[in-house]
Amino acid sequence: MVSQGRVSLFVGWITLFLMGTDLFVVSPLLPFISEEYDVSPVMTGWMVTVFTVTYAIAAPFFGWVSDKKGRGIFITFGLLLFSFSNALTAFSPSFTWLIISRILAGLAVAAITPLIYAIIGDIAPSNRRGTWLSIVVSGHLTALWAGAPIGTLLELFLGWRSIFVVMAITGTLLAVANFKTWKGVPESNSTRNLIEGKLLRIIGSVSVTTIWAISMYTLYVYLGAALYSENRFTSLEIALAVSFYGIGAVLGSLISGQFTDRFGEKKISKATLILMALILVCLGMFFSSGDWIYFLLFIWALVGYAGFTSYQARLIAEYPKERGIVMAWNNTALYIGITIGSMIGAYVISNWGYSFLPYVCSLAAIISFVLSAQKVQETKKESAFPADR
């Protein structure tokens, strides 16, 4: 049993690492792709846009159907489609086919990422659910600081197309591994009607994630530009700063599991939001303080992603019969928050400058805390009236 659990965690971790690499590796490759297809950088940016929009739309569907039909088969399907889409990206004869390939990739990842979270929540022991989730989440976050640089290195020696070939081959191997790993996991057989109230409650719950994403990505999307503008950082210093952030995110996810299992999902998810708001104020005050910026970015990511992981565990605990659709909507909420955060960041920069970004993020963290606390009160009221369930 212990051995099977380790295998499941490893397969989940490496699968999410691949999904994260596919997400994070595209942006650094856009200049090379733009040059090869002779299109503007703005046009190549649509590779990212169509991926995220497709993911956000498709993820709730796969979450809903996996709650009824089982998750393993859809994860396997997603990985096969992932392999096909990345092969198509690698060998696209035109820019139109390249865009189509990224739409298919977004559809594939929508069938994989949220369902991995959900199936880990299904099989994890109740007293270890936070730890198990934190481990697989760290796979996705490791791609932030390891997967993308490895891909960029491959581009240097073999060209950008080679990266997608490698991901296509890896996806095929993981399709086999995931099929064998999850084929014994029983279907959840959820029969609840989400239309009558439950879906609205789920959307209300994942709105916390949307505001959390705003508190993280309003600054992170423009971090490199902010460090250059405010601190005159070199490319190497910016890369070092992003590495500190990425390592903090991975460690935050991992330690979150231990604290969540010990103190509970609600306490940790709320405490991290308050702490993050304070850290962001400090980040704003000391953004141009030299080497302190590395430490503050590390702590910000550590606390922020500890909160994200604990809140995922909280959602899984609160919606045991709808884990697939909850994780899917939570991931959709995350992408919506990233999009809104980037828009808010652009507005703040154009009106007040980069130095105001940390304070806007801090305000978003406070709003997320208020929503999270309100969610706790609603849960307590529901527990007091079990007949309504």
Q: Which residues make up each language-model segment?
A:
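Extracytoplasmic gate region of multi-pass secondary transporters
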Residues: I203-S243
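Helix-loop-helix hairpin linking two adjacent transmembrane segments in secondary transporters
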Residues: W97, S126-K180, Y222
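Cytoplasmic helix-loop-helix junction between adjacent transmembrane helices
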Residues: F95, S101-G139
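C-terminal transmembrane helical hairpin of 12-TM major facilitator-type secondary transporters
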Residues: K266-Y311
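Paired small-residue
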Residues: L81, S85-L88, T96-A105, D291-I299
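Helix-breaking motifs and short loop linkers at transmembrane-helix boundaries and internal kinks
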Residues: D38, G70, F91-W97, R232, ...
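Conserved MFS/SLC helix-loop-helix module at the cytosolic interface between two early adjacent transmembrane helices
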Residues: I57-T96
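Helix-to-loop junctions at the C-terminal end of transmembrane segments
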Residues: A59-G70, G252-E265, I349
